[in-house]
C-alpha cells in the first residue's frame, strides 16, 4: 500500500441480484472517493486472512462521493467473485467483522468521458461492459437536469449485447431515459437504447434485436414484429460517421476487436474516434 494510493475501508451497503450470477454491489466508503466517469477502482477483499484484489469499472456517478457501485458477473473458479456470493462473506462485509473486510484503491483508467467532444456518442457494451457507461450516463443526466441552459445538446446511442434478455442489466433505467427522449423531442440529452441478445432460441419471449453487440453495425432489412428498434438500428448503421459520432467500446475483447475492424473500414481512427476498454476474466 503506497502513500499515494491508500486503501479506503468500505462496507457493503446492498447486493441486488439482477439475474442468476449477475448482481449489483453498492459499497459505502469511510471517506470521499473522487473519479471520472469511465474509470475503475480495485476492490480488495480480505476473508479469513487471505486478501484478493480485483479491478471493477465504477457504475455510480461521481456525485456519489462516498458510495461505489459495481456490476459484477459471477465467474466460476474466479479469483474473487465466488466469494462475493458466499453468505458468510456477505454478512461479514455488511457488518465489518474481524474476519472479513473490503477496501478500495484507485481510481485508475483512461477510458473516460470526454465532455469537450461535441459529437454524438455510441456506447457499445457486451455483458458487464455496460458498467462504465452507466456512470457516464448518470453523470450526463445529472448535468443535463441541473443546468439545462448550459448543456450542449447531444445524443447517446446505448448498444448492449448479452446472451439472454434477463442479463440486460439496468434495462429499466435506460428505457426510462429513452422513453423520456421519445416524449420530449427537444430534450438536450437524447438517449437511444438498442439491447440485443445472441441466444434467442432459449429466450422465446424476446421480440427485440438479435445478434451480438457488433451486429448492430451490420446492414439488414430483417423485420422483427414491428419493433421500431430495427429501424433505429438501420439508421444508426447507415448514419455512423467519424465526423458526427465517437464510439466507446467496453466488454469482451472479441466484440471490441470486431467492432473496431468494422469502424476502421468506415474511416474511424482508434483513440481519436474509437475509445476502448477490454474486459478479461
Residue ranges and their predicted role:
Residues 62, 114-117, 150-152, 239-241:
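Short, flexible hinge/linker loops that cap or flank conserved catalytic cores
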Residues 11-13, 24-122, 278-281:
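FAD-binding FR-type
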Residues 121-124, 248:
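Conserved beta-strand elements of the Class I
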Residues 2-8, 159-281:
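Reductase modules of NAD(P)H-dependent flavoproteins
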Residues 1-20:
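Short, low-complexity N-terminal leaders and the immediately following helix N-cap/first helix
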Residues 126-132:
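Ser/Thr-glycine-rich phosphate-binding loops at phosphate-binding pockets of nucleotides
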Amino acid at each position: 500500500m503506497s502513500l499515494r494510493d491508500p486503501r479506503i475501508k468500505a462496507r457493503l451497503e446492498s447486493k441486488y441480484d439482477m439475474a442468476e450470477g449477475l448482481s449489483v454491489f453498492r459499497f459505502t466508503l469511510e471517506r470521499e472517493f473522487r473519479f471520472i466517469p469511465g474509470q475503475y477502482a480495485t476492490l480488495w477483499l480480505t476473508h479469513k486472512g487471505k486478501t484478493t484484489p480485483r479491478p471493477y469499472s465504477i457504475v455510480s456517478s461521481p456525485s456519489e462521493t462516498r458510495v461505489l457501485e459495481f456490476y459484477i458477473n459471477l465467474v466460476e473458479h474466479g479469483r474473487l467473485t465466488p466469494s462475493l456470493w458466499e453468505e458468510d462473506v456477505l454478512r461479514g462485509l455488511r457488518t465489518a467483522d474481524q474476519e472479513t473486510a473490503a477496501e478500495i484503491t484507485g481510481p485508475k483508467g483512461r477510458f473516460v468521458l470526454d465532455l469537450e467532444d461535441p459529437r454524438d456518442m455510441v456506447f457499445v457494451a457486451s455483458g458487464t461492459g455496460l458498467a462504465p457507461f452507466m456512470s457516464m450516463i448518470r453523470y450526463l443526466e445529472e448535468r443535463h437536469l441541473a443546468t439545462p441552459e448550459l448543456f450542449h445538446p447531444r445524443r447517446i446511442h446505448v448498444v448492449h449485447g448479452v446472451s439472454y434478455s434477463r442479463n440486460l442489466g439496468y434495462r429499466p433505467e435506460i428505457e426510462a431515459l429513452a422513453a423520456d427522449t421519445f416524449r420530449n423531442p427537444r430534450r438536450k440529452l437524447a438517449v437511444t437504447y438498442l439491447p440485443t441478445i445472441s441466444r434467442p432460441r432459449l429466450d422465446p419471449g424476446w421480440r427485440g434485436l438479435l445478434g451480438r453487440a457488433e451486429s448492430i453495425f451490420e446492414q439488414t432489412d430483417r423485420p422483427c414484429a414491428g419493433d421500431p428498434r430495427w429501424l433505429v438500428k438501420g439508421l444508426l448503421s447507415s448514419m455512423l460517421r467519424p465526423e458526427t459520432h465517437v464510439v466507446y467500446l467496453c466488454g469482451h475483447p472479441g466484440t471490441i476487436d470486431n467492432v473496431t475492424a468494422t469502424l476502421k473500414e468506415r474511416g474511424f481512427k482508434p483513440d481519436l474516434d474509437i475509445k476502448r476498454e477490454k474486459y478479461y476474466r
